[in-house]
Structures are given as C-alpha cells and as structure tokens.
C-alpha cells in the first residue's frame, strides 16, 4: 500500500464473484437450517442476520452489472451454494455446478489433497455444537485490574487510571471485584483504543464482553455486530461507563455478573441475548 494510504481495487472477474456470492448464500442457508433446529446460539444468530443483510446488499449491487437473463435472487443462489458445498466437501462432481469444479480435481497430479476425499475424515473428538464456546481473543500483555476491599470511589479511580494508560490498538481488560475476599464479579472486555493527535485516547470499538458468575460460569456475553460496534468516542465512554457504574450503586450484597450483563445489554436494547434463566438471575 502506498504512503498516501490509497487503496487499489483488484477485480477478480465475474466468475469468481458469482462463485463467492453463491457460496456465501449456501452458508446462509446452513445457518438458517441450524436456526430452525434451535441449535444456533445468540452470536450465531447475529452472524446469520448480518450475513443475510450483506448478501442482500451485495446481490442487489451485483445484479445491476449483470444482463437481466443472468440475474439471480438470494433463494436461487442459496440452492447453487448448497450444491457447491457438496462438491467441495465430498468432491462429488455429480452435484453438477456449471462452470465450477474444485481446483484439486482439475489438478489431482499436483494436489496435496489426499485422494481428494474428505468423507472419511473423522469429526474432531469431543467437539459438539454445545461444546464450542467463544472466549475473548488473545491480546498481548492484557491489563488485569483486581479491586480488593476497595470503596467505590477508589475502585472507580483505579479503573479510570488503568483504562487511560492503554496503548493504541487492541486491549483486553479483566475486572475482578472482591468484596470481603469474595470474588463477586468478573468481566472481560475486548476493544480497540484510538490515540488522537492531542494525546487523548478513546475507545473506538467494543469487540466482546463476557460476564462470569462466582463459580466462573459464563452467564452472558456480547459479541460485536454491526449494531454493537462503537461508532464514536462518546459511545465508547458511555459503554464503559455503563459497566463501571455497576460498581457505584451501593448494593449491600455483592454485585452479580448477571445483573451487570443485563445492565450493559440494556444500553443496546439487546436483553433478548440472555436466556430466560439468565435474565431472572
């Protein structure tokens, strides 16, 4: 990329564009079928909705550049995409996709793909749908704040000091609230800070927020989506403040992670992300 930060657009050709759109439509079909089986969690539902919006927009744009006879709807592309998956996963050319053939079938003599047969590969042991959890991504040198037997004023000040010393870029902030040596709250926050010319730092993106109960069980989580991404620094401060304010409400009993999660979720009108059991906690 040049020093002036200009972007070079590379045209990959209409064939590759169609193949990509159709394949993503097939992925959307799989997401929807998984959702119908009630096997899709809240982050997965977010991805489904986001993918559908983006595909509808991309198809609308792409169809404008195609002759009317070649324009296809999302539903038509879903059917083609599912067939493409059969070809890719089972190396079954009988699935019949005009103009699409796996590269390793055309180049079997030079391919590293063993016999081009993936159907005999066993599934990963112990990995079922319900076993796969998304944790905050790894960040080098994460900042961890432990608040032991502090009054609310001191706890708030320590959090602000740690947040304000963050370097530019991604960060991971672990907050543990200890009251009388009882860990009552543990929250992991992932985000990205921006450094401004005047030296001021602001939270530009909230990537993920996990809340845990006293036993370490994940009771609620936020995963960044289009409508949860922070658009400006004021939103960033509001989001963090809504979390930190949970320390300042003066509860006589320990603050609970589920209550904190509900408080943060309510800032976005996203309470539906919690299961009924979590919402009642």
UniProtKB/Swiss-Prot annotation:
Protein source organism: Influenza B virus (strain B/Maryland/1959)
Location of this chain's protein in the cell: Host cytoplasm; Host nucleus
Entry keywords, A to Z: Host cytoplasm, Host nucleus, Host-virus interaction, Inhibition of host innate immune response by virus, Inhibition of host interferon signaling pathway by virus, Inhibition of host ISG15 by virus, Inhibition of host PKR by virus, Interferon antiviral system evasion, RNA-binding, Viral immunoevasion
GO cellular component: host cell cytoplasm; host cell nucleus
Gene3D superfamilies to which the protein is assigned, alphabetical: S15/NS1, RNA-binding (1.10.287.10)
Residue span of motif Nuclear localization signal: 50-55
Functional note: Binds and inhibits the conjugation of the ubiquitin-like G1P2/ISG15 protein to its target proteins. Since G1P2/ISG15 is an early antiviral protein, NS1 may inhibit the host antiviral response. Prevents EIF2AK2/PKR activation, either by binding double strand RNA or by interacting directly with EIF2AK2/PKR. Also binds poly(A) and U6 snRNA.
Family annotation (Pfam families): Flu_B_NS1 (PF02942)
Family label: Belongs to the influenza B viruses NS1 family.
Record note on quaternary structure: Homodimer. Interacts with and inhibits human G1P2 conjugation by UBE1L.
One BP annotation, GO: symbiont-mediated suppression of host PKR/eIFalpha signaling
Key word rRNA-binding present: no
Location (main, coarse): host cell
A molecular function (GO) term: RNA binding
Protein name: Non-structural protein 1
Annotated region (G1P2-binding), positions in chain: 1-103
Lineage: Viruses, Riboviria, Orthornavirae, Negarnaviricota, Polyploviricotina
Region ranges (RNA-binding and homodimerization): 1-93
This protein's record includes keyword Ribonucleoprotein: no
């Amino acid at each position: 990329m040049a020093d002036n930060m200009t972007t070079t657009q590379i045209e990959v050709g209409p064939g590759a564009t169609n193949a990509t759109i159709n394949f993503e439509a097939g992925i959307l079909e799989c997401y929807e079928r998984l959702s119908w089986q009630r096997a899709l969690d809240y982050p997965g539902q977010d991805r489904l909705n986001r993918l559908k919006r983006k595909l509808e927009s991309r198809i609308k744009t792409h169809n404008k550049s195609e002759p009317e006879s070649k324009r296809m709807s999302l539903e038509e592309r879903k059917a083609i995409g599912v067939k493409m998956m059969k070809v890719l996963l089972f190396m079954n050319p009988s699935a019949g996709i005009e103009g699409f053939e796996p590269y390793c079938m055309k180049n079997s003599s030079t391919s590293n793909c063993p016999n081009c047969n993936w159907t005999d590969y066993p599934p990963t042991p112990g990995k079922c749908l319900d076993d796969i959890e998304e944790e905050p991504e790894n960040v080098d040198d994460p900042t961890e704040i432990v608040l032991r037997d502090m009054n609310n004023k001191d706890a708030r000040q320590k959090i602000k000091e740690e947040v304000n010393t963050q370097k530019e870029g991604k960060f991971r902030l672990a907050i543990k609230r200890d009251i009388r040596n009882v860990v009552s709250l543990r929250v992991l926050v992932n985000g990205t800070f921006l450094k401004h010319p005047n030296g001021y730092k602001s939270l530009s993106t909230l990537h993920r927020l996990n809340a845990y109960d006293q036993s370490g069980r994940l009771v609620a989580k936020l995963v960044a989506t289009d409508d949860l991404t922070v658009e400006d620094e004021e939103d960033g401060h509001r989001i963090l403040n809504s979390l930190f304010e949970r320390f300042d409400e003066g509860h006589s009993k320990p603050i609970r992670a589920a209550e904190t999660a509900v408080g943060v979720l309510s800032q976005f009108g996203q309470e539906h992300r919690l299961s009924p059991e979590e919402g009642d906690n």
